[in-house]
Every structure is written in structure tokens, then in C-alpha cells.
């Protein structure tokens, strides 16, 4: 029986050690394991949330990019329309200026022709008067008259 008392004390020490471990060692270990498990779960949740936020941000970026593209396209079209309008307006103004210059030149030419005609009439009238004076100063002779008229024709 010595063997029985040893086994009894070993069992008693085992149960005391088990109780001590359950009472003082086991709770901090389970608490640390639970905290670690919670940290891992929180990290995974944060990673999932970050992934979802990234997807939302990428969606917003693609929407903003599409909006910017369409806005840029619209601005380019508007600028082209405005440029065409400015060119067309300049063309109309140039055409009006050309027409005005041509009309002014035609008017100036007509006035110059009119002045030339007036000057020519004055010259013809002066020559006619001069010829009439010469005819009247000389005696009346058909041959002399014809010669004077030929000279007047040559001067005209």
C-alpha cells in the first residue's frame, strides 16, 4: 500500500493542479484567445469594408471620368460651333466690306466718267465755238468750211 497512497496523492495533486489551472491560468488564456479572435475578425471586417470602399471609389472615379469626357466633348463641339460662327460672321463682314468697296469704286468710276464727259463736252463746245468763230471770220467758202471742219474733227 504504499502504492495506493502515492497514487492518491498524485491524483490529489493532479486535481488541485487542474482546479488551479481552471481557476487562474485558463481564464486569461481564453480571454487572450478571444481578444485575438476579435482583432482578427475586426481586421477582416475592415479589409472587407476597405475593399467595398475601394470599389465604390472606383465606381465614382469612372462616373466622374465619363462625365468629364462628355463635358469635354460638349465643350469641344461648342468651341467648334463658336469658331464656325466667328468665321462665318467674319466672312459675311468681309463680303459686305468687299461689296461696299466695289460699290464705292463703281461710284467713283461713274463720277470720273461723268467728269470726263463734262470735260469733253466743254472741250467740244469750246472747239465748236472756236470753229464757228473761225468760220465767221473768214469769208463764206464751201471748200474752206470743209477744211475747217476736217481740222475740228482731227482735234476731236
Curated annotation (Swiss-Prot):
Pfam assignment, any one: ATP-synt_B
**Which ranges does the record mark as transmembrane?**
7-27
Give the protein's recorded name: ATP synthase subunit b
Q: How does it sit in the membrane?
A: Single-pass membrane protein
State a single Gene Ontology molecular function: proton-transporting ATP synthase activity, rotational mechanism
| Family, similarity comment | Belongs to the ATPase B chain family.
Its function, per the record, reads:
F(1)F(0) ATP synthase produces ATP from ADP in the presence of a proton or sodium gradient. F-type ATPases consist of two structural domains, F(1) containing the extramembraneous catalytic core and F(0) containing the membrane proton channel, linked together by a central stalk and a peripheral stalk. During catalysis, ATP synthesis in the catalytic domain of F(1) is coupled via a rotary mechanism of the central stalk subunits to proton translocation. Component of the F(0) channel, it forms part of the peripheral stalk, linking F(1) to F(0).
Its assembly, as annotated, is: F-type ATPases have 2 components, F(1) - the catalytic core - and F(0) - the membrane proton channel. F(1) has five subunits: alpha(3), beta(3), gamma(1), delta(1), epsilon(1). F(0) has three main subunits: a(1), b(2) and c(10-14). The alpha and beta chains form an alternating ring which encloses part of the gamma chain. F(1) is attached to F(0) by a central stalk formed by the gamma and epsilon chains, while a peripheral stalk is formed by the delta and b chains.
Q: Which InterPro entries match?
A: ATP_synth_B-like_membr_sf (IPR028987), ATP_synth_b/b'su_bac/chlpt (IPR002146), ATP_synth_F0_bsu_bac (IPR005864), ATP_synthase_B_chain (IPR050059)
Q: Which keywords, in A-to-Z order, does the entry hold?
A: ATP synthesis, Cell inner membrane, Cell membrane, CF(0), Hydrogen ion transport, Ion transport, Membrane, Transmembrane, Transmembrane helix, Transport
Amino acid at each position: 500500500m504504499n502504492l495506493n497512497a502515492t497514487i492518491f496523492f498524485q491524483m490529489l495533486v493532479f486535481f488541485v493542479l487542474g482546479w488551479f489551472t481552471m481557476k487562474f491560468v485558463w481564464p486569461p488564456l481564453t480571454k487572450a484567445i478571444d481578444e485575438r479572435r476579435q482583432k482578427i475578425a475586426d481586421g477582416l471586417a475592415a479589409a472587407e469594408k476597405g475593399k467595398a470602399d475601394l470599389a465604390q471609389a472606383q465606381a465614382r472615379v469612372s462616373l466622374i471620368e465619363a462625365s468629364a469626357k462628355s463635358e469635354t466633348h460638349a465643350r469641344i463641339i461648342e468651341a467648334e460651333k463658336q469658331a464656325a460662327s466667328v468665321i462665318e460672321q467674319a466672312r459675311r463682314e468681309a463680303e459686305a466690306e468687299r461689296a461696299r468697296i466695289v460699290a464705292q469704286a463703281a461710284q467713283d468710276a461713274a463720277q470720273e466718267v461723268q467728269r470726263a464727259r463734262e470735260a469733253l463736252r466743254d472741250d467740244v463746245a469750246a472747239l465748236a465755238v472756236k470753229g464757228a468763230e473761225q468760220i465767221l471770220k473768214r469769208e463764206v467758202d464751201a471748200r474752206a468750211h470743209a477744211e475747217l471742219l476736217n481740222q475740228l474733227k482731227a482735234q476731236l
